[in-house]
Design a protein with these regions (language model features):
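Glycine-rich flexible loops
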Residues: 2-201
Length: 201
């Protein structure tokens, strides 16, 4: 019978790589570098929304506030499916509705909602609105998500309802009403319409 020596395994991990590098924030040397990074993330967001089925035709919009010009935001153009959006498709729009960069038409509803939301909430750098099948279905109930599952608990005291939906949003006054109904929350359920979420990044 062979003699077996006990193994000695070093269990001292020392500093984990996560503590050394994983939590460092990337520093950008210019607003242009930061903008490019955010545009890449915005396009990735559209692609992910499409991949997970949060899109419906060409409806819905995701925006982010420009890092240099705070009264401007980037948005998807009218008529391009989320799965097809490229950086070159994105539009830079000011709060007056003027397309400052890009050569496609802006979605009127996207402008009406997001321009007022970004104006009312300086802490919101990004906002996403979709007509996902389940989000739209749930929105027809006109109620908040109950904190009954681990997933829905993430929305506890962070959501509100807008129950005055009257069709496609075409006026900034309705955008003002949506921003007002959102208040200081992160998510608003647009009754019979869909979901709108906000964030700092």
């Amino acid at each position: 019978m062979a003699k077996v020596s006990p193994l000695r395994i070093d269990t001292e991990l020392g500093k984990l790589p996560l503590k050394d590098k994983g939590l460092e924030m990337v520093e950008f040397e210019s607003p242009e570098e930061l903008r490019r990074n955010q545009l890449e993330k915005l396009v990735a967001g559209f692609r992910l929304f499409s991949y997970f089925g949060y899109d419906e035709g060409v409806a819905g919009h995701i925006t982010f506030r420009d890092p240099e010009f705070n009264d401007h935001f980037w948005v998807n153009p009218l008529g391009v499916h989320f799965s097809q959006i490229k950086i070159s498709d994105l539009l830079l729009v000011n709060h007056d509705g003027e397309v400052v960069q890009g050569d496609r038409p802006v979605n009127v509803a996207a402008f009406a909602i997001h321009s007022r939301l970004h104006k009312a909430r300086p802490d919101v750098n990004a906002a996403a609105h979709s007509h996902s099948m389940y989000g739209r279905t749930f929105s027809s109930l006109g109620k908040l998500l109950d904190p009954i599952t681990q997933d829905s608990c993430a929305f506890y005291e962070r959501q509100s309802i807008y129950d005055h939906f009257s069709g496609v949003v075409e006026e900034t006054e309705e955008g003002d009403r949506i921003a007002n109904a959102l208040g200081d929350k992160q998510v608003i359920i647009l009754k019979n319409h869909g979901i709108l979420t906000t964030g700092s990044s």
